[in-house]
């Protein structure tokens, strides 16, 4: 995230002018903007103007007898600057665009005060965000977004015969770089030659997509994952092509490839990749890896010593009241609640846990680990000491 200008006080009002430079930045912006904030940006809007002819309400016959000409309305798309009071935010991760709907609060000749408008925030387009309260969560989110060292850490080619998807695991988003699908014929008898030809073409398409989407100046590790031997076949093809065509990005980073077995080539198998020990070791100091480890620690504790782990808002709150939380795991979706009081409640809760010496991990709902946490209410904790009576409290 490029921060162009900032003018705010901690736990007070202010504004930040910024520009999203990649998909991760848009995701952070989505988590940063909430109800009662305002956003100013250049936008486009269709505006109408009357033509020379008059009243559109008259029919052709009425116009004939009344001696009046029919009117028509011309519309044109104009570029203007608007500021909207945020009511709704939508993030389209596939299109790399964020839509912010709200009422206009900026005087403009084309759009009246109070009229609804939807701003579209895209990559490389500056915008200004105003908040009445830059709380600790907002400041942490802004800091993470502008941390250049925390870009896409991991590239994953998730595949099976005839299907390959490329994912980039970054600060908190897994964005699909490409999806390649090919119908592979059966490998038997006279059809073997056709099978080999189609498979080679499929692999070549995956190579091209990999070269297009994976930048080793940013990515620390590239994983090729599949069931069976597809990953091995593709890895061999990739290295042979790199030698034949002198593909320097591949040749210079051969040691950064890891092969991982998964149960399928579909997105849900990403969690298998992230839990692989070799992958964890390569990205052990990144935010994503730390979150995966924290979640693994929670499940291990819940399995081996269930009195030292809990989940659900009520149980976690009671655990904190007793100063028992060692590690808090919470999903970012809880902070996007349309009710400002609910959002503030969770922000204050996180701050309170930190103040009492607890460690806090805020999971992205778009990460595989975040999806797992969401299945357990989106909030969980590892405890400093056992609380066996928690199970008697209704969740």
UniProtKB/Swiss-Prot annotation:
Keyword Metal-binding annotated: yes
Main location as per UniProt: cytoplasm
Claim: Lipid metabolism is one of the keywords in the record: no
Disulfide feature: none
GO molecular function: metal ion binding
Taxonomy, superkingdom: Eukaryota
Gene3D superfamilies found in the cross-reference section: 3.30.1330.30, eRF1 domain 2 (3.30.420.60), Pelota, domain A (2.30.30.870)
Cofactor: a divalent metal cation
Keywords assigned: Cytoplasm, Metal-binding, Nucleus
InterPro entries: eFR1_2_sf, eRF1_1_Pelota, eRF1_2, eRF1_3, Pelota/DOM34_N, Ribosomal_eL30-like_sf, Transl-rel_pelota
Cellular component GO terms held in the UniProt record: cytoplasm; nucleus
A GO biological-process term: nuclear-transcribed mRNA catabolic process, non-stop decay
Compartment list: Cytoplasm; Nucleus
Function text: Component of the Pelota-HBS1L complex, a complex that recognizes stalled ribosomes and triggers the No-Go Decay (NGD) pathway. In the Pelota-HBS1L complex, pelo recognizes ribosomes stalled at the 3' end of an mRNA and engages stalled ribosomes by destabilizing mRNA in the mRNA channel. Following ribosome-binding, the Pelota-HBS1L complex promotes the disassembly of stalled ribosomes, followed by degradation of damaged mRNAs as part of the NGD pathway.
UniProt family annotation: Belongs to the eukaryotic release factor 1 family. Pelota subfamily.
Name of the protein this chain belongs to: Protein PELOTA 2
């Amino acid at each position: 995230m490029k921060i162009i200008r900032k003018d705010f006080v901690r736990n007070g009002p202010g504004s930040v002018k910024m520009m999203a430079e990649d998909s991760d930045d848009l995701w952070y912006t989505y988590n940063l903007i909430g109800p009662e904030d305002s956003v100013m940006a250049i936008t486009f809007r269709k505006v109408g103007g009357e033509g020379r002819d008059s009243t559109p309400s008259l029919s052709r016959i009425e116009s004939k007898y009344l001696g009046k000409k029919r009117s028509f309305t011309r519309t044109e798309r104009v570029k203007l600057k608007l500021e909207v009071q945020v009511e709704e935010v939508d993030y389209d991760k596939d299109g790399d665009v964020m839509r912010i709907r709200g009422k206009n609060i900026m005087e403009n000749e084309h759009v009246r005060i109070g009229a609804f408008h939807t701003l579209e925030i895209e990559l490389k387009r500056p915008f200004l965000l105003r908040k009445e309260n830059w709380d600790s969560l907002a400041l942490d989110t802004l800091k993470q977004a502008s941390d250049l060292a925390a870009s896409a850490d991991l590239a994953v080619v998730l595949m099976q015969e005839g299907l390959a998807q490329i994912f980039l695991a970054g600060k908190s988003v897994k964005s699909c770089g490409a999806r390649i699908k090919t119908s592979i014929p059966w490998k038997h008898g006279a059809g073997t030659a056709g099978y080999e030809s189609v498979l080679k073409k499929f692999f070549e398409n995956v190579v091209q997509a990999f070269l297009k989407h994976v930048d080793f100046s940013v990515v620390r590790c590239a994983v090729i994952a599949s069931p069976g031997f597809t990953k091995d076949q593709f890895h061999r093809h990739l290295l042979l092509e790199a030698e034949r065509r002198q593909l320097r990005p591949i040749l210079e980073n051969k040691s950064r490839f890891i092969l991982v077995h998964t149960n399928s080539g579909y997105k849900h198998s990403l969690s298998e990749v992230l839990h692989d020990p070799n992958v964890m070791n390569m990205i052990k100091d990144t935010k994503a890896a730390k979150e995966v480890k924290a979640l693994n620690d929670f499940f291990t504790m819940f399995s081996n010593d269930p009195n030292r782990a809990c989940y659900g808002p009520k149980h976690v709150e009671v655990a904190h009241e007793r100063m028992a939380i060692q590690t808090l795991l919470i999903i970012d979706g809880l902070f996007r609640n349309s009710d400002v009081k609910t959002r503030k409640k969770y922000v204050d809760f996180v701050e309170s846990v930190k103040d009492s010496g607890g460690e806090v991990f805020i999971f992205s709902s778009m990460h595989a680990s975040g999806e797992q946490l969401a299945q357990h209410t989106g909030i969980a904790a590892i405890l400093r000491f056992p609380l066996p009576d928690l199970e008697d409290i209704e969740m």
